[in-house]
């Protein structure tokens, strides 16, 4: 059994009840085989065994009182995975599905994504099984204050800098930042995704979606093509989906689908992004509202967003949303590119099918790194006590995404897997991390 396979088997045995984590580790380590085989010093230093084991896992209870005066208790997590390249960096997810396996999978992916940005950031992730949907502002505030009362013991501007994620938007970040400042009596850039009035960065909201489009645009440019005239399907209707749609349309594409947890819409004339923003960002409504307010739009309950004829598909909702049958539908409908806006939205068998069918597949750790890259830029602005313009941040974001594309592309060519951006992104992210870990000794 090879070194890589033995580590994967060990991870499966130790983390048997964490399928998402096992999936992420298997995908990454399998793609690293050519690099590992070329560098026996990695095995000698136990590098893979150390990379798959978090440096620290914090799990804690989060008690809070609802509007009826009843005590509620949730479970909070922070997985500090790897600090070799900088302070731990990664979002806080608030969703009923959150468990240790999901947070570990997200934290593991984050190490490589952050490495790819070339900014000084390690990898981590956190969250809680709390659902902010249907809660009052007062309930969300009490939860966030309780959550941060424990989390603040483990984070800091030079230690661990959390950010937003699913369920954690500007409101939640604001409540958490206020509580951190109150307890620690220090104003520092301990969270990113903050409001513009207290240290946030312009273009942070748009960053992941815009960055995804910049990544795909660079691929198209290198192949003598553009977004002009392309038909695009997008899943989700949160920040990533909304701003990927906005930027794609600015570049001449026609986006025809969006979705949420209840169903999806098909607008053959192209999505009216202003209407989507009104429904999702202002009213916090369901995507079905869109079909009621616009002529010629189809609304369908449940799944099915990938059954439409498109050139480019952008899964931007959540992990494991694009299954094998969806991949088959995309190929049958002529999709040429699938780029992940969400974290690991495509199942492993769907990814393999897309690649074998000649579809250009762009993994989330590279394609959606714009969010964490702009978080890194927010950290820089906080450290300097400066605020950059939207145009400055957007230009830096585009530069980072272009560099990430070429890093993944070059790594794939170097190791004989040209055009395989999954392997290329994993190799490029891993090599920087591996060199730093070797330099810092067995820690």
Identify the function of each model-found stretch.
Residues 69, 165-166, 201-208, 233-237, ...:
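Active-site nucleophile and cofactor-binding loops and adjacent substrate-binding regions
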Residues 1-202, 432-442:
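N-terminal ligand-binding/catalytic initiation module
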